[in-house]
């Protein structure tokens, strides 16, 4: 198995940061964006902090957990995978990673505890590239570890799992961005910014769970393609105005909510 070194891990994070910076700039050019972005951007410091948290979570998963997860590989399947070209491995990896991530994402909307954690991601009032990494550190582990475990069990090397994660994250950045993707035929297969933005609108937050492929939502009757108007409001359903936007408050909010639910059950 091929492990990623610390240096290679940092290069991966730099590449993702560069992609996010590029998209962040392009989406603010009026002809390229779906709507004019507010200037200055609200809660910029908060989302930079969440970006750093996401980077830290990536380092932990890659350097500490990945070497352990590689040991879960099922021999016969891993042998078959090893003879496949790298491009085929990556394509299979992205499909499986997106399926696993979509399944976990739907679970986060169904479980009260996981939803309390996932609310942080839905709290973005404006969607752009930087909104991609607005996610609680607990969510980073809940979303990344199971999805990567699926690949490791099938025999993917640490390096290829990292490449799959980079491709997935890059598409997530585009999906959260304000970029205008005009060709509707693309949405027959892929999630576009227009499609994913509908998931962040409270009225349709139970739709469009996938990050890369629309097929997962189509086969479960969860896909919606109603046109997202410029005035659609993003935010946590029922808490659009009240959910904390400051970083420290948002870090504590899921823990407070989970503790409150537990206390209510014990005293009921």
Which positions does each model-derived feature cover?
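Helix-coil boundary and interhelical linker segments in multi-pass alpha-helical membrane proteins
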Residues: 1-11, 67-89, 147-161
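Structural signature of hydrophobic alpha-helical transmembrane segments
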Residues: 10-24
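Loop-to-helix transition at the N-terminal end of transmembrane alpha-helices
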Residues: 15, 38-52
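Membrane-water interface of transmembrane alpha-helices
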Residues: 20-32, 103-113
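Membrane-interface helix-loop junction between the first two transmembrane segments
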Residues: 26-44
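A transmembrane-helix-recognition feature enriched in membrane-embedded lipid enzymes
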Residues: 47, 211, 215-222, 247-262
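Membrane-embedded catalytic scaffold of the fatty acid hydroxylase/desaturase
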Residues: 50-61, 84-233
């Amino acid at each position: 198995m091929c492990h990623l070194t610390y240096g290679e891990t940092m290069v991966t994070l730099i590449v993702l940061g560069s992609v996010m910076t590029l998209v962040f700039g392009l989406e603010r050019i009026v002809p390229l964006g779906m709507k004019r972005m507010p200037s200055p951007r609200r809660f910029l410091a908060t989302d930079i902090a969440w970006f750093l948290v996401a980077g830290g979570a990536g380092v932990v998963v890659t350097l500490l957990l990945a070497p352990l997860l590689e040991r879960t590989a099922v021999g016969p399947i891993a042998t078959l995978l090893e003879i496949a070209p790298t491009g085929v491995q990556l394509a299979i990896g992205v499909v499986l990673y997106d399926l696993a991530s979509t399944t976990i994402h739907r679970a986060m909307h169904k479980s009260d505890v996981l939803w309390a954690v996932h609310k942080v991601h839905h709290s973005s009032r404006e969607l752009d590239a930087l909104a991609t990494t607005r996610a609680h550190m607990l969510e980073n582990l809940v979303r990344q570890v199971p999805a990567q475990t699926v690949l490791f069990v099938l025999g993917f090397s640490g390096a290829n799992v990292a490449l799959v994660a980079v491709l997935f994250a890059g598409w997530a950045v585009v999906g959260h961005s304000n970029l205008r993707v005009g060709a509707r035929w693309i949405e027959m297969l892929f999630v576009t910014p227009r499609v994913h933005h509908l998931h962040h609108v409270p009225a349709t937050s139970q739709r469009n769970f996938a990050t890369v492929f629309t097929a997962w939502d189509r086969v479960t009757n969860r896909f919606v393609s109603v046109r997202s108007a410029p005035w659609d409001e993003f935010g946590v359903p029922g808490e659009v105005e009240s959910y904390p936007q400051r970083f420290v408050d948002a870090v504590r909010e899921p823990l407070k909510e989970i503790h409150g639910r537990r206390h209510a059950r014990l005293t009921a």
